[in-house]
């Protein structure tokens, strides 16, 4: 039977704005999962670049758990529900998007493709989703704004020891069309990333941190650990969130929340959104997976601000589970890098198309037709049925 969950104009069963599958057939058509794209990216990328993108901290226990925890969560199939039309459209900060799958900030994307962040932002625009640009980008904010006609998405920010640097970045991003700030709060120091240490990681010749060129801060020759230690302020507190809100009108999402108490503090100090994230398993090893802590943070947030899960998403069923546990959306990082490495812009679109199609199928098989109808009743809980 032909799969009805392909995102194309010929399918009346699916409402979607994505038309990527109308493009001519190419080698990307042979990839049917994110894991296959991962293997291809591993084959194509130089070892130092691949290790930077793929590795976690210490023994990489949290890195593995981010993915493995999803497999322990079971979904409940439903029958005889009209699922002839499944719609993944949603809204965040007043913007209508085609999918709850957002693109996480990821540094130095021109190690993955020649155009790097330009490929990614153009794919996000075509798919009608949101990309967050990393502060450690190898493409300038101005170039990305131009490529999207002044609507490049969200901007990820570290607070630097020199607050003037952070303030200038905020003003610069706001002036050219970025619609939200993503404040990363889980990196007072860089996690112990063994692979980067062994590789003496630094940017390849010809690449630089473009965002900082005007500030004469783009040189990474001393290595990432030294750069972070020199630039990022480990004395950051919740009062700095208040300061940040005082210098911008943009909504601010706090990224790196893994503790319910921190979620409450984020709300108290004015966060406009919360991203549950452990930095892709690259900071504190042996901390829980993000999907494990999401339900507890959702109980704190109670729908007051957008709640986003980051980490471990590799299948559309993972997206559905995150939404069922209370997330409004998810962010994907490494899958985007694997697509970017394999096929540039079209590779990123391939990843988005794969995951969104899988999400649509999972929604249909659990009897759901709209994102707003997803709740935790689709999560198998033996205790609910043990007395039946």
Swiss-Prot record:
Domain FMN hydroxy acid dehydrogenase: 26-384
First-tier enzyme category under EC: oxidoreductase
Catalytic reaction equation(s): glycolate + O2 = glyoxylate + H2O2; a (2S)-2-hydroxycarboxylate + O2 = a 2-oxocarboxylate + H2O2
Residues reported in the UniProt entry to bind FMN: 105-107, 134, 156-158, 184, 255, 277, 310-314, 333-334
Family indicated by similarity: Belongs to the FMN-dependent alpha-hydroxy acid dehydrogenase family.
Domain of life: Eukaryota
Subunit: Homotetramer.
Catalytic activity, EC: 1.1.3.15
Any Pfam family: FMN_dh
Role this protein plays: Catalyzes the oxidation of glycolate to glyoxylate, with a reduction of O2 to H2O2. May use other 2-hydroxyacids as substrates.
The keyword Oxidoreductase belongs to this UniProt entry's keyword annotation: yes
Recorded GO MF terms: (S)-2-hydroxy-acid oxidase activity; FMN binding
Residues holding glyoxylate: 52, 158, 193, 279, 282
CC cofactor note: Binds 1 FMN per subunit.
Disordered, as annotated region: 1-21
Cofactor(s) this protein cannot do without: FMN
Active site, renumbered: 279 (proton acceptor)
Entry keyword Nucleus: no
PROSITE patterns associated with the record: FMN_HYDROXY_ACID_DH_1, FMN_HYDROXY_ACID_DH_2
Gene assigned in the entry: haox
Protein name: 2-Hydroxyacid oxidase
Keywords recorded for this protein, A-Z: Flavoprotein, FMN, Oxidoreductase
